[in-house]
Amino acid sequence: MYYFDDTFDEVFGTRLFLIEGDITDADQVNTLSNVPFSVLINCAASVKHFAADDSLKRINTEGVKHLINLCEKTRRKLIQISTVSIAGDSLNNSIPSDRKIMENDLYFGQTITNQYIESKFLAEQAVFEASTKGLRAKIMRVGNLMSRAADGEFQINFITNGFMRQLKGYATLHQ
């Protein structure tokens, strides 16, 4: 395991089922209709902040729409893992200090500056829209993931993480 010491073996196969697949393939997603589950937790995503192709939108937005369709058809719940980054960089170039972003806030004038944030924003928009039509769904916005304090180990795709690149830039400028 890359990030954790515990493998959680005791819950796999009884309470938690990991399904490997391609959420960008609607036909493959639809094969899950026959799998017995009550809640689908989608943590599949491309977390690159930069991409030269349409992979971020295909995975993070269109893939989520395929999962929404599956959950709507089968009347199952969806938990979508998203990011606090959808808050964008600013509210009209200045975030008021008293502004609190609530769970049901999506667009409030913020600036969306990269493909990753846009793709996650559009995915949330699709989940919110589907929930107004009856989909039982929750969105969990994960904060900025950082390296482990114990050994400094960070995610595999360090070079495409916008926040870490920004920190590296600050460090380089300071030198």
Model segments located where?
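NAD(P)-dependent short-chain dehydrogenase/reductase
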Residues: 94-100, 129-175
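Short, conserved catalytic or adaptor-binding loops enriched in Gly and charged residues
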Residues: 2-13, 129-132
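Conserved catalytic Lys-bearing alpha helix of Rossmann-like short-chain dehydrogenase/reductases
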Residues: 61-67, 119-127, 166
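Active-site segment of SDR-like NAD(P)-dependent oxidoreductases
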Residues: 46-48, 84-91, 143-146
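Conserved Rossmann-fold NAD(P)-dependent oxidoreductase catalytic core, especially the SDR/UDP-sugar
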Residues: 58, 62-115, 136-138
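Short, solvent-exposed loop/turn and secondary-structure capping segments
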Residues: 51-55, 89-93, 150-151
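NAD(P)H-binding glycine-rich loop region in Rossmannoid oxidoreductase-like domains
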Residues: 10-12, 16-62, 72-74, 78
